[in-house]
């Protein structure tokens, strides 16, 4: 079987036209030469990022020794930025300090970019969150199964590009077992008693299909197809 695409195809023309969409003032609807910097309170450290970005290797006290994806920094570089750009950032709670439940912590995102009109812009977004205890019911009610599955898929793809697929599948299974033992209700040594609340019940199904999906199992898929599917996943919004 052969897959091919030509410059005359309607789909290619639509995609090329989309790249040059302009706003009401005639400027391109994208940003260039982008940097994203993260600063946060001392109890939180940044582990890394997954998405269309590269690490600038700017280490300081905010950066965790544990690296995930593009890590070892609190500043990342992007070639372009659009309303579909989506990056997953990973954080680690510091073990050095004991935080009080209900106290606040802050994460600030500082984005600098060159606008379509060639002006230099800077936007600052600050998010405030509350600490909760390890057994707080707010962890259960606040869990987003779809976002968690999307992030785990990105992590799995990041790993499978460096390790063997069966090793990544074993890692997914191990993480799912850890997830179930932490959030499931069960009587030890009695599998029939295992239950997950409705806020967690879909997540194991997502992992079941992920380990069998074209993102991980690339048998009978061309490198172009594999790259396409994985690129589409990187555009998924983590709502």
Describe the residue ranges of each PLM region.
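Extended acidic, low-complexity intrinsically disordered regions
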Residues: 1-239
């Amino acid at each position: 079987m052969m897959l091919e695409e030509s410059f005359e195809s309607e789909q290619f023309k639509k995609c090329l036209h989309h790249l040059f969409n302009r706003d009401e003032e005639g400027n391109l609807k994208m940003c260039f030469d982008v940097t994203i910097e993260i600063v946060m309170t001392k109890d939180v450290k940044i582990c890394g990022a997954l998405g269309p970005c590269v690490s600038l290797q700017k280490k300081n006290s905010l950066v965790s020794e544990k690296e995930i994806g593009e890590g070892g920094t609190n500043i990342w570089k992007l070639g372009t930025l659009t309303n579909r750009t989506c990056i997953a950032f990973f954080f680690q709670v510091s073990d050095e300090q004991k935080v009080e439940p209900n106290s606040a912590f802050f994460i600030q995102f500082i984005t600098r970019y060159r606008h379509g009109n060639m002006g230099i812009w800077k936007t600052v977004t600050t998010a405030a969150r509350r600490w909760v205890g390890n057994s707080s019911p707010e962890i259960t009610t606040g869990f987003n199964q779809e976002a968690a599955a999307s992030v785990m898929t990105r992590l799995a793809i990041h790993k499978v590009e460096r390790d063997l697929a069966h090793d990544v599948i074993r890692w997914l299974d191990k993480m799912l077992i850890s997830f179930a033992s932490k959030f499931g209700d069960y009587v030890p040594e009695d599998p029939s008693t295992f239950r997950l609340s409705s806020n967690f019940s879909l997540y194991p199904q997502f992992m079941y299909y992920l380990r069998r999906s074209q993102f991980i199992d690339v048998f009978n898929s061309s490198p172009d197809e594999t790259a396409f599917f994985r690129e589409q996943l990187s555009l998924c919004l983590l709502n």
